[in-house]
Amino acid sequence: MANTTPFAAFHLDVAGASAEEQVARALARDGMVTFDAIRSRGELLQLCNRLGTIMKHRDADEAGLTRIAKRSDILPAEGYQAFTSSHLTLHTDGSSTPEPATLVVLWCVRPATEGGMSLFVDGKQIYQVLAKEYPQVLETLSTPNSALFAGSEPPVYGSVFSTHADGSIFVRFRYDGLGYYAAPVCSVLPLFLELLERYTLSFPLQKQQGYILQNGRWLHGRTAFRGEREMYRVLICTDPATSLGISVHLGFQPGL
């Protein structure tokens, strides 16, 4: 069962003069920021350009904005569930790309009439629980080349948890028809999924509310919904030459 967490718990004023410094500190500490100071797509793009480089995406427009809404022109298919009203399972954005976006930004234009709750799980918390209580499961989920993430050409071979050269941990996961796992991983997936459910946070996004998510740390999804829910998503790669990019990159320090 998802634990409802107030939107205010991660809230920051992203329009302030020192917003970048505050966002950098919050993302380095918590991996998530929520905001309600953006009033237009133009302001959203301005915010995102301050955070890093906007990444192009298959479904994005020329500016890098992806409109996330129920679309009748797209037939149901793996990798396109975001454009339906169905439940969207917890996942890493760009799991099938070698270097996924550092940040995912989602901004609400129109909330759902019913449902459409945003779902989140802190991969750092899951990692720490596994390290303390189920170290053998963590070892299995960290085995190199124990997972295949399809959806791009070529697909990516990796693992649910991987370690970067600097010791930081990156979570890469999807649980749909484009995620394939070796037999040892499949044997521990029920426990992993149980932990995801146990530690899921949820809250609705109202009009002109949004969030910034550290993509290598937090998994995200949504519940099924009714109504004309409309969101805009932007994928961002942080620049290590900036103050934000120095402290916010793809992954987390497991012991901090």
Task: Show the residue positions of the predicted features.
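N-terminal non-catalytic cap/leader segment that marks the start of a structured domain
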Residues: 1-66
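Active-site environment of non-heme Fe oxygenases that use a 2-His-1-carboxylate facial triad
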Residues: 2-14, 23, 63-256
